[in-house]
Amino acid sequence: MGKNFYSIMLSLAGICQSIVLVNQLSETGECHSKSFEICIDSMLNLYPTTVLSIYGNKEKNLKLGITTLMSLLNVNAILKCKNSIKMIRYIFNLITLENRLENNIKYKNILFKELSILIQQHKNRVYTYDLLADRLAQIYLDTVSKLGFRIQVSGSKKVLHNIVIQNKIRCILLSGIRATMLWKQIGGRRYQFVFYRNSIFHYADMILKKINDTKYS
């Protein structure tokens, strides 16, 4: 059970890393660049051996997601942060989208096929992260956007009218759906946010302390 909670925590951190990047992009047009690249990389590994392997086998690659997860599991922190409710809404919207994708064989297969093609092309040519983001955004439009449910991203109207930002947000939402798939595959369920909040918080806190340890690399 301990190992399972660890994996569940990591997958939730992956989800949270995605939604906090979406929030940053929608508000300012910018986001934590390293975490953005990690989210893109997470979609280029279709056959992971573990949850952590999707994120470069380094817990520190999920630091932003872990800190966000901890804040969303802390009732007092939620009340103090105006964006917390919005990010919680994004999480449950991602769960809804993932459910729709899982039940739609056509678009699920298209998504897998398009990602496989992109991965092979990337191996042959090595795309930049900007180009990968554009390609992943198009895959999102070709699949997830056709599921009949859309995540309403709120933020700066000026920023959200920028096509480059729109593509980055779609790309990151796709990585959030991927993380949600992982979360469900390893036993993640909605009720855990209520009944196992403390256990998940404990594992997140433990890993964050290890990441922040100067001896940890």
UniProtKB/Swiss-Prot annotation:
Listed InterPro entries: HflD, HflD-like_sf
Localization per record: Cytoplasm; Cell membrane
Topology with respect to the bilayer: Peripheral membrane protein
Keyword check for Membrane: yes
Family label: Belongs to the HflD family.
PANTHER family recorded: HIGH FREQUENCY LYSOGENIZATION PROTEIN HFLD
Protein name: High frequency lysogenization protein HflD homolog
The organism of origin for this protein: Buchnera aphidicola subsp. Baizongia pistaciae (strain Bp)
Upper classification of the organism: Bacteria, Pseudomonadati, Pseudomonadota, Gammaproteobacteria, Enterobacterales
Name of the gene this protein is made from: hflD
